[in-house]
Amino acid sequence: MNQTVYLYTDGACKGNPGAGGWGVLMRYGSHEKELFGGEAQTTNNRMELTAVIEGLKSLKRRCTVIICTDSQYVKNGMENWIHGWKRNGWKTAAKQPVKNDDLWKELDALVGRHQVSWTWVKGHAGHAENERADDLANRGAAQFS
């Protein structure tokens, strides 16, 4: 039986670049798990990507995964842009190197292990799970600020 896991992810950055954190609320049925971490010198986009990566890395077996993020950057990157980047040797349409390609490549490999769908949620709009992911990301950032 294929399990459905919800990953609510968020990233935070104090300064951009600066101290940053990532947070994940994982939900499978009635089970929940919280993950968070951070880095001393990073960007908000790197933390958004890292949140999804860490959530996927924590899954022990193949799952149906619904990723709920407030990051259009992450959602658009995985649903639209990544195909062209890979085709163009990790260059943008303007022939520039893709920013954060190390994380995009890792995320792409992890997504390939699961059946993943992407959902965008408006950040800071009272979405309970997104607010929890945001709190976790801020806890991760606080370790370095």
Swiss-Prot record:
Catalytically driven reaction(s): Endonucleolytic cleavage to 5'-phosphomonoester
GO molecular-function terms, A-Z: magnesium ion binding; nucleic acid binding; RNA-DNA hybrid ribonuclease activity
Compartments, as annotated in UniProt: Cytoplasm
Gene: rnhA
Name of the protein: Ribonuclease HI
Subunit structure: Monomer.
GO CC annotation, single: cytoplasm
Family: Belongs to the RNase H family.
Naturally occurring in which organism (per UniProt): Neisseria meningitidis serogroup A / serotype 4A (strain DSM 15465 / Z2491)
